[in-house]
Amino acid sequence: MQVILKEDVVNLGYKDDIVTVKDGYGRNFLIPTGKAVIASESAKKVLAENLKQRAHKLAKIKEDAQTLAAKLEGVALTIGAKTSSTGTIFGSVTNIQVAEALAKAGFENIDRKIIYIKESVKEVGSYKAVLKLHKEVSVEVPFEVVSE
């Protein structure tokens, strides 16, 4: 029996895969629990159309991410932090402060969850943050930490 998976199933396949399973497993478990549907010709056509639309959407999202990455290439950020007389920051600079600096620079729609700082920022100096805009598109943004 061939079925189309509606969600990921461990040791069987991923969402939208067409897999062959034993009749009992398909009829008694996968279909009643909503994890799969029977792979009829009409269901295969609907799946093909959905995959085509999803691929188009994903291409648009990737294109938007590449456009944003090109805009972010020339951006240099300055982040102010309270420091001691030796240049050590009270606390540390995190992705939240980088997101706020990006918002001030005109990039309000960048979420802090996509910003990764490789090293701990606890002193005044120059650092780099990596923005993972898409699974295939990331950009490195330099930022300077200065004393307030």
Curated annotation (Swiss-Prot):
GO cellular component terms, A-Z: ribonucleoprotein complex; ribosome
Example of a GO biological process term: translation
GO function terms (MF aspect): rRNA binding; structural constituent of ribosome
Signal sequence extent: none
Entry keyword set: Ribonucleoprotein, Ribosomal protein, RNA-binding, rRNA-binding
Keyword Ribonucleoprotein assigned: yes
PANTHER family in alphabetical order: 50S RIBOSOMAL PROTEIN L9 (PTHR21368)
Function: Binds to the 23S rRNA.
Protein family (similarity comment): Belongs to the bacterial ribosomal protein bL9 family.
Protein name: Large ribosomal subunit protein bL9
Species this chain originates from: Parabacteroides distasonis (strain ATCC 8503 / DSM 20701 / CIP 104284 / JCM 5825 / NCTC 11152)
